[in-house]
């Protein structure tokens, strides 16, 4: 649901001036509130039209994602591309493809993530060995292995497409410029991880306005906590 939210809320960045969009998110709270509201209005609409069932979402959290889809009980599922190789191995006779999210009037959007960080502590006891490990993990051949296992796309130049052909439609979307990072580095705060309170409210039947205010408050609380830590350190 967070990916659906981002695809709809960030539509102006995907099809317009992304730099101006993120600058406004960082500096104009009224613009931020309108952006959040656009995303939550979309989720509330999907909920009210029963495009997703709240009880089923609870079951998905507690069980294997995709079980209803692969069993033929649902015509489609919404999930990360990382699940495509898993589903393909679990149901070898099941045929499917992974497509961008069709959530805007201007076209479908692929929501991207960069969430596999590797780092080495300069204060560690075995820095040379740790550096060697990271160098090995980030070699082109190992990046290819990792991406194939995750249904992901390599950041390396001239890298081949993933071995999992089911996710190839996503590349066409990205190649056409219809992709957006859910945690864009131009944002000065981590909006992606502050959406949960608003989404939980949507699932409980609350309004898009209530969900928006919940996330605004979560962002304020996070900022105050950050400033408090900086004050103690100084």
Residue ranges and their predicted role:
Residues 62, 79-85, 116:
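Beta->alpha turn/N-cap motifs
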Residues 55-70:
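Short helix-initiation/N-cap motifs at beta->coil->alpha
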Residues 19-58:
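Glycine-centered hinge/linker elements that transmit conformational signals in sensory
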Residues 92, 147-201, 229-234:
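Long, aromatic- and glycine/proline-rich binding clefts that accommodate carbohydrate-like moieties
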């Amino acid at each position: 649901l967070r990916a659906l939210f981002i695809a709809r809320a960030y539509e102006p960045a995907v099809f317009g001036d992304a730099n101006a969009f993120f600058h406004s998110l960082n500096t104009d709270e009224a613009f931020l509130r309108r952006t959040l509201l656009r995303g939550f209005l979309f989720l509330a609409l999907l909920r009210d039209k029963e495009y997703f069932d709240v009880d089923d979402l609870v079951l998905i959290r507690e069980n294997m994602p995709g079980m209803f889809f692969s069993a033929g009980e649902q015509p489609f599922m919404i999930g990360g591309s990382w699940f495509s190789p898993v589903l393909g191995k679990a149901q070898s006779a099941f045929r499917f493809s992974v497509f961008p999210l069709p959530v805007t009037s201007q076209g479908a959007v692929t929501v991207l993530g960069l969430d596999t960080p590797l780092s080495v502590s300069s204060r560690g006891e075995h820095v040379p060995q740790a550096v060697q490990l990271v160098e090995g993990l980030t070699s082109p051949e190992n990046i290819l292995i990792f991406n194939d296992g995750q249904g992901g796309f390599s950041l390396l130049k001239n890298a081949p497409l993933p071995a999992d052909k089911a996710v190839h439609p996503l590349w066409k979307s990205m190649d056409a410029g219809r992709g957006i990072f859910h945690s864009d580095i131009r944002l000065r705060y981590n909006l992606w991880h502050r959406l949960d309170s608003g989404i939980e409210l949507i699932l409980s039947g609350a309004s898009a306005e209530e969900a928006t205010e919940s996330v605004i408050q979560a962002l304020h609380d996070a900022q105050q906590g950050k400033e408090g830590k900086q004050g103690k350190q100084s």
